[in-house]
């Protein structure tokens, strides 16, 4: 390697003005200047894959105060010898193995129990549902980055998990397997410690990812029903609501992104309420949290 250069950075391609992908390797010299060159001949050329226009992780396209605009997942393609194989292994091996772990640890069985398909105790810790939702979000973005593989086993896994969540949602829109069956009366009783709104936030984020990656409203419908219940439940006492906020932040950013996805203003207002009520009238203690 020439002594005046640092190691090559991973190279990527981005869609240009005409929609074509332009590959480049970016090298940073010691003086801080950047050099662009063609990728190594060993990297096979690929065509960019079409994705829904809204396949962005955070959508600030209609946010007037946002300084940056996101790039859709399909507009950037890593093709280097380091990160690209990692993404492929994540897609083909890691995410499917995590699905198996969700089964082995009975996280998925908890949803079957909530749906009345299994008679037995809840297993695991009270925030286990969030692990299922985090897996769904990761799997959805993996599908978004590989739309030609949407009919493979990973898609079937996603659909199966969504079916379990649909079955676990009750008639009010509530979804949380820990507070189902024998603990229904304890819902919203320990927001500081039991992560109910935290789990709800991860469900919403998983639903948004799935919707943006596939165009399907299936999980999004579950999430909006739950979000509507949350909006109807939490707010000023004068409105007959619970004047509380969560102990573990998460629901706020999820509701903001749900607003960006649906255009439903009440989700943005609810996120603002949760932020404004935190710490009101106190500098510590349970009321602060």
Give the positions of each predicted feature:
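Glycan-recognition and catalytic cores of secretory/periplasmic carbohydrate-active enzymes
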Residues: 2-289
């Amino acid at each position: 390697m020439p002594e005046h250069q640092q190691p090559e950075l991973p190279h990527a391609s981005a869609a240009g003005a005409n929609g074509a992908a332009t590959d480049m390797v970016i090298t940073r010299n010691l003086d801080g200047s950047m050099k662009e060159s063609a990728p190594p001949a060993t990297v096979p050329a690929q065509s960019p894959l079409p994705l829904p226009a809204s396949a962005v992780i955070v959508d600030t396209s209609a946010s007037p105060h946002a300084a940056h605009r996101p790039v859709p997942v399909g507009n950037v393609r890593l093709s280097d010898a380091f990160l690209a194989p990692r993404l492929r292994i994540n897609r083909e091996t890691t995410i499917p193995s995590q699905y198996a772990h969700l089964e082995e640890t009975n996280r998925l069985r908890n949803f079957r129990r909530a749906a009345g398909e299994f008679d037995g105790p809840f297993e695991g810790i009270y925030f286990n549902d969030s692990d299922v939702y985090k897996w769904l979000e990761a799997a959805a973005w993996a599908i978004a980055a590989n739309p030609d593989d949407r009919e493979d086993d990973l898609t079937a896994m996603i659909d199966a998990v969504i079916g379990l969540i649909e079955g676990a949602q009750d008639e009010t829109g509530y979804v949380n397997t820990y507070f189902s069956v024998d603990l229904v009366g304890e819902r919203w009783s320990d927001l500081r410690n039991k992560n109910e709104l935290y789990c709800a936030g991860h469900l919403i984020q998983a639903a948004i990812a799935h919707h943006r990656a596939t165009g399907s409203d299936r999980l999004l419908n579950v999430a909006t029903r739950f979000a509507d219940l949350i909006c109807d439940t939490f707010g000023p006492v004068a409105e007959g609501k619970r004047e509380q906020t969560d102990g573990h932040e998460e629901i706020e950013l999820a509701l903001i992104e749900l607003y960006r996805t649906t255009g439903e203003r009440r989700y943005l207002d609810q996120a603002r309420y949760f932020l404004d009520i935190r710490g009101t009238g106190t500098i510590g203690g349970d009321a602060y949290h």
